[in-house]
């Protein structure tokens, strides 16, 4: 899913935090950058003035403006034209420095937004890079119920009617927290991190068959809702299996695997839904087991090692 942001949207988002003033190029407010564009061409999202590998947001600090002032008139004009030619999303001048008139004119003529901020260059760089990276990060919407269980993000998935919402309701009654029902949105904010949030229209809501839509915040209190959580585990509910001993399920290690989400392989544990099974307890146990495995503790491996040692000690 591609996301985009316009110069106007970025300015409105950061105006108060960075004390931005828009001094030229107001006609370029609809200029935009999208995630597909950044992945295809791989420019830096924000950085100090660079006329060789241009950034999407060019920051002009004291050294950059001093360097421009030191150029001969023809070279200065050529450099400013080159900056404009790269078509950045915006130019930002730091520390409330005076903007050169020729740069202001060039920004107006080419409709390149030109902003001024009292913040220092590295503050602008860090802040804009961070927020642009989050806004334009790859994202996906998955079907399921996303919850915080024992302080980690767990996505409960399964076909319609498998009992996801009823399980979520039981987990809520046991003190765990809801992030999103039905359509949680996941954003890859780092190479190994998927951040899950709830769409605004679904905020605080949980749909349970027979009961309809429930407001979790009103029923369980503010502490039952979590704004966002990193996805660490997927628990998948399967349809009932009638065989007494289901083939394909490892008795020692359980049914564990991974699911590919965006660029990450997320650990997955499959639980068969059968009459009489307490899925809430099983989901809690699956979460605890995952936490142990991340610490290098695997009960199945320990048992296999004990069994092997016992066989080795037995006389022939």
UniProtKB/Swiss-Prot annotation:
ATP binds at residues 158-165. Keywords: ATP-binding, Kinase, Magnesium, Metal-binding, Multifunctional enzyme, Nucleotide-binding, Serine/threonine-protein kinase, Transferase. It comes from the Bacteria. It catalyses: [HPr protein]-L-serine + ATP = [HPr protein]-O-phospho-L-serine + ADP + H(+); [HPr protein]-O-phospho-L-serine + phosphate + H(+) = [HPr protein]-L-serine + diphosphate. Mg(2+) binds at residues 165, 207. GO terms for molecular function: ATP binding; magnesium ion binding; phosphorelay sensor kinase activity; protein serine/threonine kinase activity; protein serine/threonine/tyrosine kinase activity. It is an enzyme of class 2 (transferase). Its EC number is 2.7.11.-, 2.7.4.-. Residues 206-215 are annotated as: Important for the catalytic mechanism of both phosphorylation and dephosphorylation. The active site is at 143, 164, 182 (proton acceptor), 251. GO terms for biological process: regulation of carbohydrate metabolic process. SUPFAM superfamilies: HprK N-terminal domain-like, PEP carboxykinase-like. Residues 272-277 are annotated as: Important for the catalytic mechanism of dephosphorylation. Its cofactor is Mg(2+). It holds the Pfam family Hpr_kinase_C. Both phosphorylation and phosphorolysis are carried out by the same active site and suggest a common mechanism for both reactions. Catalyzes the ATP- as well as the pyrophosphate-dependent phosphorylation of a specific serine residue in HPr, a phosphocarrier protein of the phosphoenolpyruvate-dependent sugar phosphotransferase system (PTS). HprK/P also catalyzes the pyrophosphate-producing, inorganic phosphate-dependent dephosphorylation (phosphorolysis) of seryl-phosphorylated HPr (P-Ser-HPr). NCBIfam families: hpr-ser. HAMAP family: HPr_kinase. Belongs to the HPrK/P family. PANTHER family: HPR KINASE_PHOSPHORYLASE, PROTEIN YJDM-RELATED. Homohexamer. The Walker A ATP-binding motif also binds Pi and PPi. This is HPr kinase/phosphorylase. It comes from Xylella fastidiosa (strain Temecula1 / ATCC 700964).
């Amino acid at each position: 899913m591609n996301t985009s942001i316009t110069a106007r949207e970025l300015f409105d988002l950061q105006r108060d935090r960075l004390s931005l003033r828009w001094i030229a190029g107001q006609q370029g407010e609809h200029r935009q950058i999208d995630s597909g564009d950044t992945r295809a061409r791989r420019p830096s999202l924000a950085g100090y003035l660079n006329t060789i590998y241009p950034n999407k947001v060019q920051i002009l600090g004291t050294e950059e403006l001093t360097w421009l002032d030191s150029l001969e008139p023809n070279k200065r004009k050529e450099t400013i034209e080159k900056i404009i030619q790269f078509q950045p999303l915006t130019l930002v001048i730091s520390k409330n420095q005076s903007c050169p008139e020729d740069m202001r004119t060039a920004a107006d003529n080419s409709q390149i937004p030109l902003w001024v901020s009292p913040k220092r260059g590295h503050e602008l760089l860090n802040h804009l890079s961070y927020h642009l990276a989050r806004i334009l990060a790859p994202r996906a919407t998955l079907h399921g119920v996303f919850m915080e269980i024992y302080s980690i993000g767990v996505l409960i998935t399964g076909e319609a009617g498998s009992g996801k919402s009823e399980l979520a309701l039981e987990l809520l009654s046991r003190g765990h927290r809801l992030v999103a029902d039905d359509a949680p949105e996941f954003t890859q904010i780092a190479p190994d991190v998927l951040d899950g949030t709830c769409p605004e229209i679904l905020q605080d809501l949980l749909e349970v068959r027979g009961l309809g839509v429930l407001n979790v915040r009103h029923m369980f209190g503010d502490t039952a809702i979590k704004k966002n959580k990193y996805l660490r585990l997927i628990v998948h509910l399967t349809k009932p299996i009638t065989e007494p001993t289901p083939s394909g399920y490892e008795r020692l290690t359980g049914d564990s695997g991974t699911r590919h989400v965006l660029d990450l392989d997320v650990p997955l544990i499959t639980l068969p839904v059968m009459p009489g099974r307490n899925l809430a307890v099983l989901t809690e146990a699956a979460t605890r087991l995952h936490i142990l495995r991340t610490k290098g503790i695997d009960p199945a491996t320990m048992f296999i090692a004990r069994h092997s040692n016992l066989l080795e000690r037995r006389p022939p």
